[in-house]
């Protein structure tokens, strides 16, 4: 069992009403937990990951260009190493995300091959069903969800999700912790909840950390479990009852560079783009909404972030 203070829950047990008080305290206090028994197994994760990794390693430049979107407000298809910068969005720097990725959603997808599409669509559907059920449990447990204010849960969870597979290669010397402490800047997700399935670094280094109770807590790989993180839409949907924990991906030190590569399969359960919220309330919940309007939509917010995220600087040589 991994050494972590973050609780582990089982979806079937939660469905049957077990651990309700512990679950409520966890989601309203931490906003992050591990989940087992959610319907996707190791075989599912491995097949989807291997399919993307084969494309990352063997796809030609022309093949990658064919599935790279030129629409900056969309997360679809291939995104090259260091093509994005979470730090630019969060205004914490200009360094790039040291990762490459492939993304898909409900529609507007681009795939390298029919087989890639088949594998990923089956994987997407399993994670979508699990995320919807989990989000329903999380929002209900919070005690802050009010259908008269937000609308029905069914409508909220009939969502606009995104699946993104990130590959974090071994870092070059100029991206080791001594030079740049993070592979990916601190941020909270623009989602209701997020599923994160990780593969461990071969050398044992733990990259993913979340801020819990004012301290950074490592989130190691737990066998047969995903990390579930409340995103920024969670406090907006529960009148602030749920937090949206900031998290980041650490860089290894120079002595831990070898064997530090890892993958992260991330499923963002996002509301539809017309989900509206009060900008003032969002700011009162600690969310950095940089929009000059009283009422904004999810589409307004995420569109601005995606444009800002695309790295303006050329990747550093190293």
From Swiss-Prot:
Keyword Magnesium: no
Enzyme class: oxidoreductase
Required co-factors: Fe cation
Keywords for this protein: Antibiotic biosynthesis, Iron, Oxidoreductase, Vitamin C
Tree of life domain: Bacteria
GO molecular function: deacetoxycephalosporin-C hydroxylase activity; L-ascorbic acid binding
Domain Fe2OG dioxygenase: 158-271
Presence of keyword Cell division: no
Record pathway: Antibiotic biosynthesis; cephalosporin C biosynthesis
Gene3D superfamilies attached to this UniProt entry: B-lactam Antibiotic, Isopenicillin N Synthase, Chain
SUPFAM superfamilies, per database record: Clavaminate synthase-like
Family note: Belongs to the iron/ascorbate-dependent oxidoreductase family.
Quaternary structure note: Monomer.
Name this protein carries in UniProt: Deacetoxycephalosporin C hydroxylase
Provenance organism: Streptomyces clavuligerus
């Amino acid at each position: 069992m991994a050494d972590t203070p973050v609780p582990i829950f089982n979806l079937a047990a939660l469905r049957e009403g077990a651990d309700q008080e512990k679950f409520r305290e966890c989601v309203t206090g931490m906003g992050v937990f591990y989940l087992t028994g959610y319907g996707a197994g190791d075989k599912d994760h491995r097949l989807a990951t291997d399919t993307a990794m084969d494309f990352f390693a063997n796809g030609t430049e022309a093949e990658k260009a064919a599935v790279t979107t030129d629409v900056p407000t969309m997360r679809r298809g291939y995104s090259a190493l260091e093509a994005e910068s979470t730090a630019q969005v969060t205004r914490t720097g200009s360094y790039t995300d040291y990762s490459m990725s492939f993304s898909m959603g409900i529609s507007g997808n681009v795939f390298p091959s029919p087989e890639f599409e088949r594998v990923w669509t089956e994987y997407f559907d399993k994670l979508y069903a699990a995320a919807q059920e989990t989000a329903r449990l999380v929002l209900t447990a919070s005690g802050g969800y009010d259908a008269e204010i937000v609308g029905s849960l069914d409508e909220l969870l009939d969502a606009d999700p995104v699946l993104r597979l990130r590959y974090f290669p071994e870092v070059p010397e100029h991206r080791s912790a001594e030079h740049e402490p993070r592979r990916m800047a601190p941020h909270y997700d623009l989602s209701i909840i997020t599923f994160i399935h990780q593969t461990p670094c071969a050398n044992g280094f733990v990259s993913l950390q979340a801020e819990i109770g004012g301290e950074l807590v490592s989130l190691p790989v737990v066998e047969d479990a995903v990390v579930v993180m409340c995103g920024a839409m969670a406090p907006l949907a529960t009148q602030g009852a749920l937090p949206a924990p900031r998290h980041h991906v650490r860089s290894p030190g120079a002595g831990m560079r070898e064997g530090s590569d890892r993958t992260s399969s991330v499923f963002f359960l996002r509301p539809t783009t017309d989900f509206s919220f009060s900008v003032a309330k969002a700011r009162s919940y600690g969310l950095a909404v940089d929009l000059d309007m009283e009422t904004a939509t999810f589409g307004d917010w995420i569109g601005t972030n995606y444009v800002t995220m695309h790295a303006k600087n050329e990747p550093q040589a190293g």
